[in-house]
């Protein structure tokens, strides 16, 4: 039995065998498919990690990244377009111009906006502007006079300002102010009556109406008082100038009133008019009010020594 088995083994060694040949393309294709599978898996895992990271990022960082990308995109587009244009220009120059005749020069300036100028860091920073701009082709051949708006009240053709004539022409304003004050006082009296007997839902509206009328009465009273005071001062100055004219006719030399004398004359005329309306008590009250105002002003301007804190003696 052993001899038979040895014979069979020796026969199998000498027997012809089939060669197992494998194409190299098949092996390389299988390797490439495996590499592609691994790369797709890696890219998908990378995308997942990026998405998870982006979802965890704050909105401020995302907005900043979007802003940076928007600034980078036009620059890259302009670079690509400039490269293409350069290639086209070189191709055209090689085809059109013969060697030895010289090359065409590019433009020194361009109307197209520049993308390499960065934006300002803040709105208070200075703006960067390109210096390569074309000179304007416009030329001023004929000088056109510029139209200036003028107020006809202050033209030399209107003449000088005459205060007496102005007061005569606009004397109706004082009467209008008095009539307006009388009407406003009547309306205020009526509004206060309505406020006293008004229901709760209309009370706030009527209070606002009363307040508005009170403010209007105060404004009109100040206008009427100013008109009366101006008239008193005008009459005082007119009386002084008339006396001076009569003295000059009698042979007195020229004399002009000083500012201090004028101020004293106007103060005296104001107090006389106040005494005519309210008596000596009103004049005394006005003088006390003026003195109090002056003393308060002096007190504010007075230098005070540094405050010393008193210590308690135990």
UniProtKB/Swiss-Prot annotation:
Coiled coil: 173-224
Keywords: Coiled coil, Nucleus, Ribonucleoprotein, Ribosome biogenesis, rRNA processing
GO-annotated cellular components: 90S preribosome; nucleolus
UniProt entry tagged with the keyword Ribonucleoprotein: yes
Region described as Disordered: spans on this chain: 1-136, 239-258, 274-314
Compositionally biased intervals (Basic residues): 290-314
Residue ranges, compositional bias (Basic and acidic residues): 94-119
Compartments where found: Nucleus, Nucleolus
Biased composition (Acidic residues): 1-12, 76-93
Record's compositionally biased regions (Polar residues): 46-56
Pfam families tied to this protein: RRP36 (PF06102)
Lineage: superkingdom: Eukaryota
Biological process terms in GO annotation: maturation of SSU-rRNA from tricistronic rRNA transcript (SSU-rRNA, 5.8S rRNA, LSU-rRNA)
Complexes and interactors: Associates with 90S and pre-40S pre-ribosomal particles.
Protein family membership: Belongs to the RRP36 family.
Cited function: Component of the 90S pre-ribosome involved in the maturation of rRNAs. Required for early cleavages of the pre-RNAs in the 40S ribosomal subunit maturation pathway.
Protein name as it appears in the record: rRNA biogenesis protein RRP36
Protein's organism: Laccaria bicolor (strain S238N-H82 / ATCC MYA-4686)
Gene transcribed to yield this protein: RRP36
